[in-house]
Structures are given as C-alpha cells and as structure tokens.
C-alpha cells in the first residue's frame, strides 16, 4: 500500500490523470488521481488494450478496500466503477481482468472485477462504504439491506462465452502462451479455478439440487510459461528505438546512443559460453574486516571518454545445475520440493551507488592504465582490475580470459560533443577461485579468530578449536552431547543456533560488504525488485539471458538433428478392406442387442458399461484399426465430447481467446476423468513415440529446464518451433516443424519422461552445413559468411624454444583436463560429505553403544541381585516348610488328647444332669 500512498502525495509524471467531476462525499472530495474515469477515458483504455497492452485474467483476494478504489493481492488496483455485480468485501475472492501499462504509476489496473459466488459467507460484515447508497441500494432504519452471496442468477457474466470455452484452462495443458508479449517481466497468470467452478455447478445441478459443498483440496499446478524472446538474437547493434522495441518497460537514458553486442563475436555458436566452472562470490558481513584496497578509487586524471566495467558471474557450476535437473526428473512419481531454477542460481556481483545497484568498474586513467585504450586492449583491462580491487576487494589480475561482452556509447552534450564509451568485460572469475586446501586453511584461520570471544563457554570452544571446518564442529558436538540418534540431531540444531554461522562448504571469493549479489531472475523477471537497478545492469541481464537462450536453444537444435525422424506408415488397402468387413459383421451382431435395449426403456441406455480405462466405447470407424492410424489423424479422434460426470473429452475446434491466451487448432487437450479433476499424471500417460534407444545428454535436459520457467515438465510445439526460429541460423517454419515433430506427441514435448545420461554432445557426426542451418545458402554479409562461426585466424602455431606449438589444441586439451579435474573434485567433495556424514553416524552409534553397554551392565548387576534374593527366599521357604511339618507332627497327638478330654467331659455332663430331678 505504500505505493498508493506515494501516488496520492507525489504522482509520477507518467501517471494517468483522471478527468471529470468527482462525486461529493461526507468525508470530502476524493483524491483527484483516484476519481472514477469518465466514458471517454474508458474508451481510451479499451483502445490501449486493443493496441497490444498486456492483459491477464486471474482470481485473487481483495486485500484493501477504500471509498473509491480497492487493491487485489496488494498489486492490482481497481476502481469501484469497474465492479460487475455485487460489491466485494475485504478478504473475498474475486475474478479480475487486469491490464498492464508501464507508463502509469500503478502498472496493473483492473478493467473488470466480479465477486465469485462459490465461497462461504464471511463472518465479519463488510466495512461501511459511503458509495453504497449512491449505487442504488436502499437503506432502511437499521441500515442497508443484507444481500446473499449465493445469487449467481443476479450477477451478470463477466465473459459471455460458450460453456465449452471455460474448459480450456486445463490443469494438464496450460495453453496460455504468456511469453508472446514483447515486454520483459511477469507475463501474467491464468485463472485455474473458473473451469472447475463451472464444472462442479453443472454436476450438482444434474445431481438433483445437492447442497453446494466445499471442493476437495488438490495439487495446484503452476501456470505454463517459457523464457523466450519474440525476436532473433543476432543483431550486433541496438540503438534507442531497438531497445524500446525489445524491452518496453526499460527506461533508456536521454544521452544513450547505442550498444554493441560484442558477445556475438566472443561466443559464437561453435564456441558458446560455458557454465561448467563453478564461480561462487560471497559478500562478507559487516563485522568482518574488509580487504585492503589496492589503489585509490578515483584518480585525479580519470577520463570519462572510456570506462571499463566487469560482469562478475556467480554460478554454482554445471554439475550442480545437472543435479537440480535430475532431482526434478527423479521426482516424477512422488513430487516433493521443486528445485531452484537455473536463472535463480546464476547471480551477478554488483556495486552500490546512491542506493542503486550498478556495475563494478570506473573511468580510464592514462597515468595508471595506459595511454591509448583504442589501440591497446590491455588498457581497459587494467582499468577494470584496478576499479574492481578498489570497489569489491577482489583481485582480478589472475583471470586468464577477458571477453568483451558489450559496449555502450553515450553522447556527452556541450559545445565540444564527445563520445563516451563504456566497455563491459566478462572475466573468467572461476580461475581465481581458491582451491579446497586454501579454503580449508582460510576456514581454520577464521575459526581460530572467532574462538577467543567465545571463551565464556569452555565446553563449546574446545570443539571449535579442534575442528578445521563446520562439519568437524558438528561431529564433535554430536560426540559430546548426543546420547541417542534422535537426540543427536536435536542437540546439533540447538547448539548451532546461538553460535556464529559456519563458513560455506564450497570455496568462494569473498567480496566487500558494500556489494550485493542479485540473481538473473531477480533482475529480469521480478516485478518489484528489492534493489534499484541501473540501466546498464538491466540491459546486460537481458543480453546475458538472450545469450543463454541462444546457447540452450542451439543445444536443443543439435539434439533434434541427432534424433531419427518419425516414420508414419500409411494403412494398407487390404487391411482396410478386411477391417471394413469385420466391422460390418460386428455391426450386424450388435444391432439385435441394441434393439432389445431400446425396448426396455431409456434407463438401460444410460447404464452402458465403461471400458476399463474409464473411457466411453468409441463408435466403429471405417478407416481400419486404431493402432494403424497415423499420429496426425489420432488427434482428430479426440473430437468426441461427453459431459458425463465421470468423463470429460475436450477439443478445440478453432481459435478461442481467454485471458489473453490464444489456442491453436493443433493444440488438443488431453483426456481427464474423476469428475473433471485434471491431474498432471495424464501427461505422463501419453504415448511416447521417441525411440527408447535414444538417450539424450544432460545438457539437453538443462536446456529444456531453462526454457520451462515454472517447472511444468513439458514444452508446447509452438514454443519449440519459436526457439529454433530465434537462433539466427535462418531456418524456415517447415524445417522447424519437422524437427520439433521428432520429440512432440500430441503437440507437447514431455522432456521430463525422456532418457538422459552423462555423455558428450551429439554434434560429432553431424555435417557443418547442417549445424549452421541455411546460412550457407544465403548471400554473404559484409563481415562474414557465417555469423555463428568462430572467427578464423591465420594459424594457431606459435614458435617457442625452437619448436612450433599449436595453441588452439593446447587450450582445448587444457579445457578437457580442467573439466575432468572439476568433475573429480566434485566427486571427491561429495564423497567427503558422505564420509563425514557416516563419521557422524558412527560417532552417534558409538555413543549409543556405550549407553546401551552401561545399561546392560546395570541390568546384569540387578539380575545378580535378584537371583541372590531368589535363592535366599528359596532357603527361607524350605526352612519354613520343615518347621510347619514338625509342628504338624507335634500337634497331631495333642489334638487327639484334647478330643478325648472333651469327650470325657461331655459324658460326665450327661451323667450329672438327671440327678437333681430325683
């Protein structure tokens, strides 16, 4: 809401000024900028929308509501005059049709807003709004009359379309080609719930007036979106108009002349830029001491005619990117957490200037760097090294390659007009990365420096001094404190929280605290970036993204060339005749049961059994069996549609438009069952016509993942064709269509279900004229015949110590050895992590074993005591038994004697009783 407050106080020069008289209110006149527009402005907005502005239709929640306007999802502004039907309440779910206009202060403005009717009544009443009475609602003594939410017949339709058009937002096929908009940035989102709401209404109306209940929770799939530019990425120069055409939301400075794309010659198609080497750059915290600067930041004789800047790349390396892609492919059965996209892992180290993220670099100094930067290319390299050392603390003098990435030209006004040139280099930062031994030594040094302040807890400092890195610290704490495996993990997390964060496990270059690391996704795709980004950073991020698009697209092109073509065998006439005869016989046999079923009544017709796969039985066709049909005709058989609750067959008969997304005739939606609950598993069940023996390299998987912005797992045919057409190798539309058909099934390429392995590229056996498309057929340009080919030199032989050395071959060999070394280092690092984990588990198991052994000794002692007690009790028992037997033996004669005495006493009593009577 801060942006709306700023809008009231200081309207931007590009903001829209609403005209017309404002309706008075009890609170006074409304804000002038937020006055409802008149009819003429609405018609102008409609003309703007027809002129190519971006639109999107989505469902959102009303997060803010005021007297004259509201906000949906804290980013889409809507006037209350565009609300159709009942006014929404705060927190309600609404259907929004919004338009994007970068010239306004608030770029996203709603054109239509409608409250959804399939949501429960809100507990809290709506806030009192002053415009309720003005909109025609009658008020009584107790206030406004309450309205029921569930009144769908009173709400006018927002998009009057046929019912079938609502089903095109399938969860299995998101056919919203959101990348067709030329402006860079978020391309909108498609409403995923409208078709399901319509579906559930129809089912419950047919079911006989069942109460409207809550829908079952289900897994919402991300919308389909690709990273793709709508133009060919081979233009060597971009002027002011070209930049505005490519990037409409970019603010170009007024003194800008042109930018030369030097990366086209530095990284041709035959030698693309490689992400194989990991180059991690980390910004140190404010507490750590910054490294000393090597030179003064601004020399006295600096000349703005030439400036040198560097693009410091921070990348995890190709192995880490492969690992994320393989995690995505391996989680097909049980999708868990979505891995991070490559665009979010590729980052750039930028400096700060007046709260703005800028490139690292500065102006040329003749006294420090050299005299002639135009003749000597090392002059600007020295400038870049000096400025990078002063601004970031990173010494780039150890970099072996300096690629000229782009060259900006500005016009300095004044009586002597001057041309200012800014050269941007891309150095190989991975060559100055510390080795594992150096990194471990640095971590030990930092651990030793951090140990003295933490002397209050001696039990915690001992493992810190002994451990060389964070893993050994965790192992020592687990040995000391853990008693069971579960307690081990809990105590490790508890003890790590109050301590200082451990150093990263992977080697990295440490930069000064004033710098910032921004990902490529955050610069290009983020609508509301946290950092203010300069013009040059935005352009370079777009150019770097276009370079990656060309390189990954070329990998897809080479992969398609290596795959065999699909052979479609036409049906034989003899088999067709035999199939016709069999079907005629079947029709005659089936006629009699059908007649009997019709006599029984219409109830039996609706009880026809379904097949085992859940599909209705198809009527017999005269074209032969289904297996013998070509795939092109198979899509035509999906034209049937049954609106049964257990079946939904969708088909597109022509181009329809919903939410700014066009559907093509060739794009047929897949089959879904289970009461129209579209699931992603139906995509995996599609037939795969790719040769099972064709195993693709991992770089093809990475290329597919790069274009798939939201990890949907598939790419559309149209997007694959456009990827090939934007490479700059001048392919025709028919060539692209034939190549794409090798991996496409039903207009979709399910790259997630293909087979991949760690092997080299597939362009080894392909001829050169095929690799460069149709460039050899076109007339040569002014500079070179093949722009994609590497510039040819006279000879790569250099005389050294009396012998000729092939420098190109040596460089290639060194590159191969470096790649092998990196792979082995990654494997060793992985094994070290596994070994350390096993060591931690072993230590925890040792502690558990010791605890169990102590418990066992205690139990043994208690068992011995119990046995001794049992023996004592047994002895006492036997003794008592003997005493009882002896007492019994002695008491028996005494008992007999007492019995005799009693009998005698009784006899005497009987004798004495009759005497007194005489």
From Swiss-Prot:
Record location of the Glycyl lysine isopeptide (Lys-Gly) (interchain with G-Cter in SUMO2 and SUMO3) cross-link: 586
Pfam families per UniProt: BURAN, DBC1, LAIKA, S1-like
Modified residues (N6-methyllysine): 123
Record field: transmembrane: none
Region ranges (Disordered): 1-35, 179-219, 446-510, 568-637
Principal subcellular localization: nucleus
InterPro entries: BURAN, CCAR1/CCAR2, DBC1/CARP1_inactive_NUDIX_dom, EF-hand-dom_pair, LAIKA, S1-like_RNA-bd_dom
Keyword match Cell inner membrane: no
Modification N6-acetyllysine, positions: 112, 215
PTM field: ATM/ATR-mediated phosphorylation at Thr-454 upon DNA damage promotes binding to SIRT1. Phosphorylation at Thr-454 promotes its sumoylation by switching the binding partner of CCAR2 from SENP1 to PIAS3.
Source organism, top-level taxon: Eukaryota
Modification sites for Phosphoserine: 124, 569, 622, 670, 673, 676, 682, 803
GO biological process: apoptotic process; DNA damage response; mRNA processing; negative regulation of cell growth; negative regulation of DNA-templated transcription; negative regulation of intrinsic apoptotic signaling pathway in response to DNA damage; negative regulation of proteasomal ubiquitin-dependent protein catabolic process; positive regulation of apoptotic process
Coiled-coil stretches noted in the UniProt entry, renumbered to this chain: 824-904
Annotated crosslink Glycyl lysine isopeptide (Lys-Gly) (interchain with G-Cter in SUMO2) location: 586
Skewed-composition ranges (Low complexity): 447-468, 482-492
Residue ranges with Basic and acidic residues bias: 572-597
Residues recorded as bearing Omega-N-methylarginine in the entry: 180
Region listing for Interaction with MCC, in residue ranges: 605-665
Phosphothreonine PTM positions: 35, 454, 484, 892
Cell compartment(s), UniProt: Nucleus; Cytoplasm; Cytoplasm, Cytoskeleton, Spindle
Signal peptide positions on this chain: none
Annotated Gene Ontology cellular component terms: chromatin; cytoplasm; DBIRD complex; nucleus; spindle
Function: Core component of the DBIRD complex, a multiprotein complex that acts at the interface between core mRNP particles and RNA polymerase II (RNAPII) and integrates transcript elongation with the regulation of alternative splicing: the DBIRD complex affects local transcript elongation rates and alternative splicing of a large set of exons embedded in (A + T)-rich DNA regions. Inhibits SIRT1 deacetylase activity leading to increasing levels of p53/TP53 acetylation and p53-mediated apoptosis. Inhibits SUV39H1 methyltransferase activity.
Name assigned to this protein: Cell cycle and apoptosis regulator protein 2
Source organism per UniProt: Pongo abelii (Sumatran orangutan)
Lineage per the UniProt record: Eukaryota, Metazoa, Chordata, Craniata, Vertebrata
């Amino acid at each position: 809401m801060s942006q709306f407050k700023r809008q009231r106080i200081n309207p931007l020069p590009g903001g829209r000024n609403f005209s017309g008289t404002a309706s008075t209110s009890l609170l006074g006149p409304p804000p002038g900028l937020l006055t409802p527009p008149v009819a003429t402005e609405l018609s102008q907005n409609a003309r703007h929308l027809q002129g190519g502005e971006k639109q999107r239709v989505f469902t959102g929640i009303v997060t803010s509501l005021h007297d004259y306007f509201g906000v949906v999802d804290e980013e889409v502004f809507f006037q209350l005059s565009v609300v159709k039907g009942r006014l929404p309440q705060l927190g309600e779910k609404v259907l929004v049709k919004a338009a994007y206009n970068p010239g306004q202060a608030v770029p996203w403005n709603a054109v239509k807003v409608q409250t959804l009717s399939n949501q429960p009544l809100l507990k809290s009443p709506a806030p009192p709004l002053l415009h309720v009475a003005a909109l025609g609602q009658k008020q009584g003594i107790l206030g406004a009359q309450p309205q029921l939410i569930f009144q769908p017949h009173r709400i006018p339709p927002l998009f009057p379309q046929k019912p079938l058009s609502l089903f095109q937002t399938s969860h299995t096929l998101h056919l919203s080609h959101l990348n067709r908009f030329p402006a860079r940035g978020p391309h909108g989102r498609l409403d995923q719930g409208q078709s399901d709401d319509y579906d559930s209404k129809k089912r419950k109306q047919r079911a006989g007036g069942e109460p409207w209940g809550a829908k079952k929770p289900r897994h919402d799939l991300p919308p389909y979106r690709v990273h793709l530019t709508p133009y060919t990425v081979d233009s060597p120069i971009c002027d002011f108009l070209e930049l505005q055409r490519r990037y409409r939301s970019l603010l170009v400075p007024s003194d800008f002349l042109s930018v030369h794309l030097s990366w086209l010659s530095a990284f041709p198609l035959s030698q693309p830029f490689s992400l194989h080497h990991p180059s991690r750059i980390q910004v140190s915290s404010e507490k750590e001491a910054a490294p000393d600067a090597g030179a003064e930041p601004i020399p006295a004789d600096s000349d703005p005619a030439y400036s040198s800047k560097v693009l410091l790349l921070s990348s995890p390396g190709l192995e880490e990117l492969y690992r994320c892609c393989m995690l995505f492919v391996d989680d097909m059965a049980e999708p868990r957490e979505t891995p991070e996209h490559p665009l979010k892992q590729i980052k750039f180290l930028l400096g700060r200037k007046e709260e703005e993220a800028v490139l690292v670099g500065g102006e040329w100094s003749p006294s420090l760097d050299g005299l002639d930067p135009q003749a000597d290319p090392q002059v600007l390299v020295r400038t870049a090294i000096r400025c990078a050392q002063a601004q970031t603390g990173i010494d780039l003098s150890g970099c072996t390659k300096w690629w000229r990435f782009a060259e900006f030209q500005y016009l300095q006004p004044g009586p002597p007009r001057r041309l200012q040139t800014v050269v941007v280099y891309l150095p190989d930062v991975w060559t100055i990365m510390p080795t594992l031994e150096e990194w471990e030594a640095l971590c030990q040094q930092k651990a030793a420096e951090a140990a003295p302040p933490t002397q209050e807890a001696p039990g915690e400092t001992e493992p810190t001094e002994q451990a060389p890195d964070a893993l050994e610290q965790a192992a020592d704490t687990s040995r000391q404190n853990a008693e069971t495996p579960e307690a081990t993990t809990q105590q490790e997390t508890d003890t790590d929280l109050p301590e200082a964060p451990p150093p990263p496990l992977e080697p990295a270059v440490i930069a000064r605290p004033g710098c910032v690391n921004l990902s490529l996704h955050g610069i290009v795709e983020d609508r509301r970036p946290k950092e203010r980004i300069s013009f040059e950073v935005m352009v370079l991020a777009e150019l770097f993204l276009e370079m990656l698009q060309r390189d990954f697209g070329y990998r897809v092109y080479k992969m398609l060339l290596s795959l065999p073509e699909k052979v479609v065998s036409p049906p034989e006439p003899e088999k067709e005749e035999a199939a016709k005869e069999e079907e005629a016989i079947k029709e005659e046999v089936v006629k009699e049961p059908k007649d009997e079923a019709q006599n029984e009544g219409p109830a039996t017709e609706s009880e026809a059994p379904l097949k085992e796969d859940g599909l209705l039985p198809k009527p017999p066709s005269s074209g032969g069996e289904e297996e013998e049909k070509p795939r092109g005709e198979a899509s035509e058989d999906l034209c049937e549609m049954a609106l049964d609750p257990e079946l939904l067959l969708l088909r597109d008969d022509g181009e329809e438009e919903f939410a700014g997304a066009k559907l093509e005739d060739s794009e047929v939606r897949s089959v879904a069952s289970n009461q129209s609950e579209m699931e992603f598993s139906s995509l995996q069940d599609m037939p795969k016509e790719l040769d099972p023996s064709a195993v693709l390299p991992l770089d093809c998987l990475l290329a597919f993942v790069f274009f798939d912005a939201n990890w949907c797992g598939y790419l559309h045919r149209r997007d694959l064709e456009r990827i090939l057409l934007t490479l700059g190798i001048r392919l025709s539309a028919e060539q692209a269509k034939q190549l794409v058909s090798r991996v496409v099934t039903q207009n979709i390429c399910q790259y997630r279900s293909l087979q991949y392995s760690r092997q080299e590229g597939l362009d080894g056996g392909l001829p050169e004229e095929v690799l460069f498309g149709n460039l050899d057929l076109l007339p040569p340009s002014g500079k070179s015949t093949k722009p994609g080919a590497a510039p040819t030199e006279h000879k790569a032989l250099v005389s050294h110590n009396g012998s000729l050395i092939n420098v190109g071959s040596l460089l290639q060999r060194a590159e191969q050895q470096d790649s092998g070394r990196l792979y082995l280092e990654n494997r060793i690092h992985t094994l070290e992590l596994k070994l350390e984990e096993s060591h931690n588990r072993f230590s925890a198991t040792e502690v558990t074993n010791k605890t169990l052994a102590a418990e066992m000794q205690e139990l043994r002692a208690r068992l011995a005591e119990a046995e001794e007690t049992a023996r004592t009790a047994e002895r006492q028992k036997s003794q008592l038994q003997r005493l009882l037997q002896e007492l019994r033996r002695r008491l028996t004669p005494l008992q007999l004697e007492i019995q005799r005495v009693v009998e005698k006493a009784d006899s005497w009593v009987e004798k004495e009783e009759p005497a007194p009577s005489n």
